[in-house]
């Protein structure tokens, strides 16, 4: 399922060329993605979960208890396939590895193994695009 929203308050072209560096620009887009998902009634769990093999930008929880691991990408233009297309097979593997690490290190806090989903929030060409269930762990 794909949800598209005009960026409007989410971003301006200045965010793509800010002299403060890509880490701060990335953090700003992650914050905007988090705000968007919370308005969609997902609950914030964690941000920038890292392990040796990868990182997850956002961990959210659906109302039904499912954990949603979110990759946030931003591109000023849609050339070369846009932001979502930049998440290739290797990046998907790293995200899945980080999610497995996250679940393993928090198994004592989780009563049962929750259902999990991998989503992408892409900011591209003036729009926010939400790709629910963008890829599956068993496909990478």
UniProtKB/Swiss-Prot annotation:
Tell me its family.
Belongs to the UPF0102 family.
Q: Name one GO molecular function term.
A: nucleic acid binding
In Swiss-Prot or TrEMBL terms, this protein is called UPF0102 protein Bxeno_A0149
Which superkingdom?
Bacteria
Which InterPro entries has this protein been placed in?
Restrct_endonuc-II-like, tRNA_endonuc-like_dom_sf, UPF0102_YraN-like
